[in-house]
Structures are given as structure tokens and as C-alpha cells.
Amino acid sequence: LVGSEMCIRDRIKIETTIDYKDIKGFPTSTVPGHKGRFVFGYVDSVPVVIMQGRVHYYEGYPITDVVLPTRLMGMMGAKKLILTNAAGGLNTDFNPGDFMLISDHIATAIPSPLIGTNIDELGERFPDMSEVYSRRMREIVKEQADKLGIKLREGVYVQLTGPQYETPAEVRMCKILGGDAVGMSTACEALAARHMGLEVCGISCITNLAAGLSDKKLNHKEVQETADRVAKQFTELITAVVRAV
């Protein structure tokens, strides 16, 4: 899965692309920077499918539709899922442009994608979530970042609903809960993937400091500009991780 304005498409030998709008009944992306298509191909000899743009809960879709692309990739045979996002920094040691490896998440502000009748073919009714983000994959990301000379942070990601940015009071709440970064995606997809038994890792690009931690007002343009600035490093890291896992 590829988040806001972060794409490794240029490193892939592309076999085919499929637009979400061409799949009957499939949710489509409406956010600038999210192209809304699957890209199928290879990184070296590794077969990959990339979700170039995701759908968000705040776009009005039920949470089960938000994770439908994740479910579909698992049903197509994907065994490992690399989730990325643009996030606001809660940890005051972070700077815009930093990458944060997700060690765990807090997702109590959104409905679980597992609510409702369980589909036993996908996974068990009460799945364990003590290690949502694979320790093995996290070590690989750290190793590859070190080889590339990329500074990598690590921390807890908080998913809120959006689309509005967080208030300073909400930011303080997230920090008290132990969050290091906050955003509007990713955790729900990780839950659905783990339910299906996929191995998951997640990386946040810290595109801005969360509300109340700087004098700047938040806007989506800043998110895109920061993501653009670090896109090359991001591409190098994700490509190296795909080769290594």
C-alpha cells in the first residue's frame, strides 16, 4: 500500500495496471495525490502488487469497504504487506521528512473492520493482535535503512477518522495515550491484514508536526510537499525492503 504522494512505481517492471473505477462495486480514491489503481509487476524477481492510492474512512465508505483492497490483495495471494502513510508528528523529537517505523498502533477512534459476521475463510473470530507489525520485518527495515544511511525513527501510530486535522487538545490526548504519530489510515488495513494472516509492517512519513506543536496551520499542500521532498529516499528504502523480505 502506498500513501500520500509516495510511489515506487518507477522501480517496478510493470506488467499491468487496473484502475479502481474499472472494478465493479470497488471503492475509489477521491483525495489529491491518490491515483486510485493497482499496479502489478516485479521488483527484480519479486512479484508485487501496489495500491497506488488508498481509500479512507473519511471519504464516506463503510470501514469494511476501506479494507476491501487489503482483503483483495490477500485473496490474490499476497503474504506480506508494507503499509505507508503521511502522518503528523506527536513526538517532539521528530521533524518533517523523518520516517517512523510503526511498532504498534492505537485505533480505538475508528470502528474495527472485523465488526460483523466473521468470514471464517478469511480468519478467526477473535484474532490475536499482540504483534500487528511483524518484529521480523521491522528488523529488516532497520537493517536496510542503516545500509542506505537513512535515519529511521520508531514509534506508535494513532489512527483518527479525519478528514479534519486534529485539535491541539486531541493531540495532547494522543500523546498521553503514548502515540508518536497520528494519521487517518493504516491501522484499519493492518487489522484486516493480520486477521487474514498476512505479515505486516508500516512506515510513516512525518510530513508535519501535529496541531499545537508548532506555530504553523496545517494544510494538505504541506503534506504533499514534504512527501515529494523525501520521495527518493522513501523509494530506495521500500525497494530495498521488498528485495530483503
Model regions and ranges:
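Short, small-residue-biased leader/transition segments that mark boundaries at the very start
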Residues: 1-8
